[in-house]
Every structure is written in structure tokens, then in C-alpha cells.
């Protein structure tokens, strides 16, 4: 039990304090990528817990049931029964919903009556628990009996400490419409105290299975993440017990025309053939009238984005290992005619929580989206968008080069902990991208090598013809001069070190002589950017010295953000945090103008 103060409420449940409730609140992922196999931190732990359960029950093909008979549950005698399989059946009518338990202590519930009540009060609740933090009548799950063609189901929250849907609290006295695959949590804690279920709409599942969905072969369990037009659920292969991430793409929400549906399937067919040690693999594909299902390799390390927020910045050797993997996987895609076009830390996954072994996801499907959907996805994370995406009206006008721009931005963030173009909320943010207006402010970049700065300057280049290709990036001295150290990282993670890259001839040899040279020759933002070239570096150095004292306050603010970086932050608050850090660049630009 948590050491925080508790109090007993009128209904007999133990009420947690506001501080404790905040600690219980799991992370909410604001946006998911179109083919990501990532999990939220809460989803990772759930997947890990369930993995142990699955291994113990591989001989039992009914993976969505738990056979533990020592359940801390009692049922009312008149409307429920327990079957030998470990399933609790409530009611005697048509099976319309299931609650698949995510904790082996509790069984799966089959709902055969219009409503059930969960809580602690025996004789009142259909499904009871003994935990003191559960209310007498905690929540009610019910469907609208007047709708016959489909299920319209709700959860009423009648609890003191909260009922949660996909890690979001409903609120006492409120109700919410639930959909197939929602996670309903009575106690959202991790581990043995967790009381959570996946709601399975039996009508929807049966319909999808009859149309060729994966339900015949896989048990679809908890939601690992949701987004604008897709969700990811943990899938357990019934025959083997192996776990996968099943990406469910809603074709209607993706605004699929007939032509684009064909394009989507063409892209998927190409992606199923992609095989690379740093790219999420697609095991198989299912399609129904409503959804496209991608069965993906499951990784448990979360997103690189979360690692950036927690670690703030990385040593150059670590960055080099991360970028070497990223660039090698992008080179593989480009050599096979595939442009990722949405590279960002949210789409770069970690194979395990304690390593930097990368797995990139969400590649190749952007061409199947309509223009509005694609731009909506891009604008959700504008820090990584190449200028040609903002200036060209048709996506056919750009391709592989946008990946190199994104790699440059990612490299910048990994090395210093904040993005190059400032806060996206500022009015001139997109103009900075279009004009390549960024800098290497002191003191944050003082200890970072000129080689790293040179690579970034050749990647974040507005002129596409002058921007590095992926082969040129891999042949840059920042990589080639430090291969022995990078190989040690590869050996530690048991990865095959990539072969040498073939250099392109049409782009200039990288210049590593000065970190203070003009960043973007074609820049239109001279009033924001340094008005210096290699011939007046002394002037530039004086400006940097003047800025050092002024930047102390910014450093203190950044440290305060570090101290407040808790594990319970939501995805949106983490993005706001990264935006706050980006003000370092905004303040630096203003100071340069004054100087």
C-alpha cells in the first residue's frame, strides 16, 4: 500500500489523496504512428506481465481465459455461473460482450445480460473484489437493448477513486461510450494489484472474423496505443502463444478512396518483403471491409521520444550508434525505393528498455493517405517536417530527401536536448523551417564536435540539391572516423555491423573545418540567422561569449524542467516540455539580433 494518506468514504472504499491519484494516472499517448508497434509505458509492462502468463499456458489455445481458481471474486448466485475453463458467465442470454482479464488473479467475464455492476458489495454487484480501494458499486457496464444490429455499450463511473478507460479517468457520475478493444481499469496500478479488462464486442469480433480478420488465428488483447485512424493491440497467436503488435487501420478514417485502397495494399505488399535488423517486420496482413490488420514484430523498449525526454541528451558515442542504425535502415529503404517520409523519435522504437537497439516503424504508408490526412499527421509533429513539404502543393514533388532533413533534426535534438527551430507555437516557426533558420547556441553546443555540427549543417539544408543523400551522410567523418567505438555498441547488442556505404558524386565533400560557418547559404532569415561567414568567425565568437552570461537563466530553467520530469507525464505534456526547451533557440536568436 502506498504510504500516502488514505481516508474511508461513505461507501466503504479507501479514498486516495489527490497526489496519490496523480501517481496512479498512467501515461496517455496523444498520437500513434500509422504502422508503429510501440507501446506506452503502461502497455509495455502489461505486455511483459502477460508474456509470462502466456508462456505458462501455451498448451491452452484459449488464451483469452485465465484458469486460476484462487480468484478473489464472488458472483451473485441468481445470474452467474463459473465454468471449468476459468470464465465467469453473467446472465443466460445472448453473449454480447467479454471482459478479458489482464491480471491472472481474475478470470475473463462473459456478459449475457444487458448490464453488470462491478464493485465490493456482495449481493449488489455481479462481480466483486476485496481490495479496499474499490468502491461498493464501482462501475456499471451496460448496452442499449433497443439497438439490435450492433452493440452500443457504456461504462458509468460510480466510484470514489475512479474508473479508467484506456488510462483516462471517466469521473464519478459520468459515463462514456466504449468500443471494441477498450481497456477498462478498476485499479490501473501495475503488477499484482492491477484490476483491468479488455472489452471485447462479440458482435464486432465475429463480424470481422467472418470477413477475414485475424481473430480466428490471434487473440486480440489490450490496447497498446491509439491514434487518429489506427490503434495497436497486443495479439497472441493461439497456436504458439507468441506475442505480436497488431496494427488496426480504420480505412474509413483514413479517407480511403477506391484508388487509395489499392495503393495502400500495394504499399503493404512491398513492406511485407522488407527485412532489416533495425526495421519493424510485418509478419502477415489481414483485411476486412472496415479494417486493415498488420501483424507486426512486438518490441518492448518504447519510443526514442520517451528516452529523449527522460535522458535529455546523449553523449556523442551513443548518438553515433543511434544514428548509425537509423541511417543504415533508411539507406536500406531508399535502396528498395521506399521513402519513410515521417521520421521522428515517436516512430523510432527501442527493442528493449535497457538498450539503444533501434527498430524504425511507420514507413511507406504515407502515399496511401489522402493529402489532408497526411498533412494532419505531419502537422502533429512539425519539428521534423522538411521545408519542401510546407512549400510544395503535391507530395509527388518530394521524396527521399525529406528523410535526410528529419535525420538532421533528430541528430540535433539527440546531441543538445532541444529542437533546432524553436517553439512550434511561435508565429515565425514555419518560416524558420522554410529558411533553414537554426544555430548552435552556447553553452549547449560548446563541447560538441565540429564533425557533428558539420553533419547537421549538411542535412538540415533547404536546397534539396545540396542536402546530403543517405550515402553521403554515412560517409561523413563523424561516422567514419569513429567506427571502432561504434562497433563496440553493435557487438554489445549482437547486431551485424553494416557494410561500407557507396558515396554519391553529385554532392559536395563535407566541410568539417568550422562550427561557426553560415548554416544555410540560401537562408532568407539573415535578421534571425548569424550574419557571418567563415571570414568573420571572430565576430561570431564574441557574440557567443556575450551570450554565455545571458544563457545562465535558460540553463536554470532547463534544470528545473529536468527535476520535474516524472514518470507519470502524458505524451502531450512531454511534447510541451520539449517545446519549452526549444525556447533556448528562440532566446538565442533574439539575443543575436540585439548584438
UniProtKB/Swiss-Prot annotation:
Domain FHA: start-end pairs: 116-170
SMART domains linked: FHA, S_TKc
Region annotated Disordered, chain positions: 1-84, 494-595
GO cellular component: nucleus
Polar residues composition bias: residue spans: 32-49, 508-520
A molecular function (GO) term: protein serine kinase activity
Keyword Cytoplasm: no
Pfam families the record matches: FHA (PF00498), Pkinase (PF00069)
Reactions performed catalytically: L-seryl-[protein] + ATP = O-phospho-L-seryl-[protein] + ADP + H(+); L-threonyl-[protein] + ATP = O-phospho-L-threonyl-[protein] + ADP + H(+)
Domain spans labelled Protein kinase: 218-479
Residues reported in the UniProt entry to bind ATP: 224-232, 247
PROSITE patterns associated with the record: FHA_DOMAIN, PROTEIN_KINASE_ATP, PROTEIN_KINASE_DOM, PROTEIN_KINASE_ST
Family: Belongs to the protein kinase superfamily. CAMK Ser/Thr protein kinase family. CHK2 subfamily.
Name of this chain's protein: Probable serine/threonine-protein kinase fhkC
The species this protein was found in: Dictyostelium discoideum (Social amoeba)
